[in-house]
């Protein structure tokens, strides 16, 4: 017999009262029927769905040990922990520049997963190491998302990206914070143990800053309310998550995820934060005033490196939320040299990707130095950092990649500055040795 968590309705439509009857309690864990999804009743005992799942897992391991006595027991999931130096070296292969940010991330991630190892071996009387979530501050296209993605790949842990602008308070149109955890659960193929040691990157976190410091009669459902909702999962708590995502509803069974070991990396451009810092610094007697006043426009990483928690509070983040992000790192804007290196140097550089695609069609692809310089110049004009590089190249390469697979006589394709500017086509080298420039 199975008892649902809700008491049965009486014939008059009201709830049936237990009266003097004691509540149904699991004989193994002591949870009541109101605390679980379902309860199985025996002649003299009850067992809840959670204890059933735990029992199945225990029996599975025991049966496996009997059938395969020489096989070592299945180890608990452990991320591939590397030293900060090794972590940074791995990041260097994919992320150009941002030396200080990579060092900060390497140390923070190393300490985070070392903390998990310490917790696993803890006897209960050692110092408790708190979780160090990370805040990345930098303009769009500087590599915030790429840094987080590369870290997750390096450690071989589940990873998901959430857009803070899509989050709203529970009860309003939009995603609630549990949706983020549902995505992480999907990324781990519903392996709860892996999900609980994953990494979540929350992008555009600056967009959930309070719209105004003044109290308003209108609810800020995508600002301070979302910050409050994120607090519990940032610090660590057990959250019921709908396995299929979406909003929770009373009839839905939930998967409980403990977030205390999930690493959260939050990133945002924080436009205007440098002005808040500049005003604070200019009021001090440290001689910065004259230096700062001339830098009231544009992105100034040197000013942002002076950021404090008070500055973030003035920007619109609540103190409790700021306190959950103890590690802060400022990313540098990318100059022309860095953008050019991004095109050709990383393991998955855009130029290398296009060369590989052409190679699959039996064609060698080459970019002239002038062509790369034009790509960089156009990207700088657009002002979106490294993100503009792909859009510039894709706009140029789309017609070439459309036509080339049907050109069996071509063995080499050269992209020139004229190709990038669309004042001329690429130079094709045919298999007979002749060259042809497409107008």
UniProtKB/Swiss-Prot annotation:
Alphabetized Pfam families for the sequence: AAA_2, ClpB_D2-small, zf-C4_ClpX
Protein name: ATP-dependent Clp protease ATP-binding subunit ClpX
Function according to Swiss-Prot or TrEMBL: ATP-dependent specificity component of the Clp protease. It directs the protease to specific substrates. Can perform chaperone functions in the absence of ClpP.
Binding site for Zn(2+): 26, 29, 48, 51
Domain ClpX-type ZB: 14-67
Subunit structure, as described in the record: Component of the ClpX-ClpP complex. Forms a hexameric ring that, in the presence of ATP, binds to fourteen ClpP subunits assembled into a disk-like structure with a central cavity, resembling the structure of eukaryotic proteasomes.
GO biological process, one term: cell division
PROSITE patterns in alphabetical order: CLPX_ZB (PS51902)
Coiled coil (UniProt feature): none
Region (Disordered): 1-20
């Amino acid at each position: 017999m199975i008892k649902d968590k809700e008491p049965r309705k009486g014939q008059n439509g009201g709830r049936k009262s237990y009266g003097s009857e004691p509540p149904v309690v699991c004989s193994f864990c002591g949870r009541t029927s109101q605390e679980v999804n379902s309860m199985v009743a025996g002649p003299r005992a009850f067992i809840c769905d959670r204890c059933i799942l735990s029992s199945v897992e225990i029996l599975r391991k025991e049966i496996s040990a009997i059938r395969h006595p020489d096989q070592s027991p299945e180890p608990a999931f452990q991320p591939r922990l590397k030293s900060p130096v090794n972590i940074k070296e791995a990041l260097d292969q994919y992320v150009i520049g941002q030396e200080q940010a990579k060092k900060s991330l390497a140390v923070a991630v190393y300490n985070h997963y070392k903390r998990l190892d310490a917790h696993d071996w803890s006897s209960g009387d050692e110092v408790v190491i708190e979780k160090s979530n990370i805040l990345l501050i930098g303009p769009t296209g500087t590599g915030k998302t790429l840094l987080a993605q590369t870290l997750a790949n390096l450690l071989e842990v589940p990873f998901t990206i959430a857009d803070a602008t899509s989050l709203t308070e529970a009860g309003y149109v939009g995603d609630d914070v549990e949706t983020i955890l549902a995505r992480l659960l999907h990324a781990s193929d519903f392996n709860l143990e892996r999900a609980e040691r994953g990494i979540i990157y929350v992008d555009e976190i600056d967009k959930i800053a309070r719209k105004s410091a003044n109290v308003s009669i209108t609810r800020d459902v995508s600002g301070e309310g979302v910050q409050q909702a994120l607090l519990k999962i940032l610090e660590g708590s057990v959250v019921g998550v709908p396995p299929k995502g979406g909003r929770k509803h009373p009839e839905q069974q939930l998967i409980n995820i403990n977030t205390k070991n999930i690493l959260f990396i939050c990133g945002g451009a924080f436009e205007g934060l440098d002005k808040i810092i500049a005003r604070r610094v200019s009021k001090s007697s440290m001689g910065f005033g004259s230096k700062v006043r001339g830098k009231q426009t544009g992105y100034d990483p040197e000013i942002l490196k002076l950021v404090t928690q008070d500055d973030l509070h003035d920007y619109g983040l609540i103190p409790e939320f700021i306190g959950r992000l103890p590690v802060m790192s400022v990313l540098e804007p990318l100059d022309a040299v860095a953008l050019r290196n991004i095109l050709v140097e990383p393991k998955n550089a855009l130029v290398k990707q296009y060369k590989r695609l052409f190679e699959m069609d039996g064609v060698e692809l080459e970019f002239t130095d002038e062509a790369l310089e034009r790509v960089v110049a156009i990207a700088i004009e657009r002002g979106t950092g490294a993100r503009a590089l792909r859009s510039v190249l894709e706009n140029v390469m789309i017609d070439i990649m459309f036509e080339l697979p049907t050109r069996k006589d071509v063995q080499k394709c050269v992209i020139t500055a004229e190709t990038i500017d669309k004042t001329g086509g690429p130079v094709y080298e045919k298999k007979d040795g002749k060259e042809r420039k497409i107008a």
